[in-house]
């Protein structure tokens, strides 16, 4: 029986995913280390300033833990925690340079992400399997991706972290 391959997270891989994120209309790109059916999801997400991550939460069936664990391994990220009405409860600056380098969000935490530096890389872990239709519960009242309203909102959030 052949062993599964050893998977490496190299700077070359990060540079390739970053280049792809810069070409993407969404200004971000994932690279999965897992198969979608696996119990533990492991991936990097490279974000560029200007990307819009619609506020959302993760709700899972009772047998699955809906936590998310983020480690910023390159660049800097703003994380905005909200209540169900979209009011900001907390803003966190998470950076590869510290002092805060990682965050674990419990299931049901409504959040969005703001890239504060080019080629920001998040190493993320969460319980699977991944089901595209059920992965995110988007917060009502926030614009869809690709809209002018979404772009305006990103500018507001970026300004909050850069003031």
Question: What are the roles of these predicted feature ranges?
Answer:
Residues 1-44, 92-95, 156-163:
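A short, N-terminal "cap"/entry segment at the start of jelly-roll beta-barrel domains
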Residues 26-27, 45-64, 96:
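Conserved short histidine dyad/triad with adjacent acidic residue
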Residues 43, 51-54, 75-81:
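Short beta-strand segments in beta-sandwich/barrel cores
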Residues 43-45, 62-72, 103, 113-114:
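His/acidic/aromatic-lined binding-pocket segments of jelly-roll/cupin-type domains
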Residues 55, 79-81, 103-105, 111-116, ...:
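Short beta-strand His + acidic residue motifs that chelate non-heme Fe in jelly-roll/DSBH
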Residues 66-84:
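Glycine- and acidic-residue-biased ligand/ion/polar-headgroup-sensing regions
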């Amino acid at each position: 029986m052949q062993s599964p391959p050893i998977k490496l997270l190299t700077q070359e891989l990060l540079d390739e995913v970053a280049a792809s994120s810069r070409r993407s209309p969404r200004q971000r790109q994932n690279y999965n280390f897992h198969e979608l059916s696996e119990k533990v999801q492991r991936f990097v997400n490279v974000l560029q300033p200007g990307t819009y991550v619609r506020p959302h939460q993760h709700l899972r069936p009772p047998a699955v833990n809906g936590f998310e664990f983020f480690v910023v391994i390159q660049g800097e990220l703003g994380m905005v925690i909200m209540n169900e009405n979209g009011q900001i409860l907390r803003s966190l600056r998470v950076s590869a340079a510290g002092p805060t380098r990682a965050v674990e969000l419990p299931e049901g935490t409504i959040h969005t992400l703001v890239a504060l530096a080019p080629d920001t890389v998040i190493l993320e872990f969460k319980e699977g399997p991944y089901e595209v239709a059920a992965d995110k519960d988007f917060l009502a009242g926030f614009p869809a991706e690709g809209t002018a309203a979404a772009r305006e909102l990103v500018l507001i959030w970026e300004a909050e972290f850069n003031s």
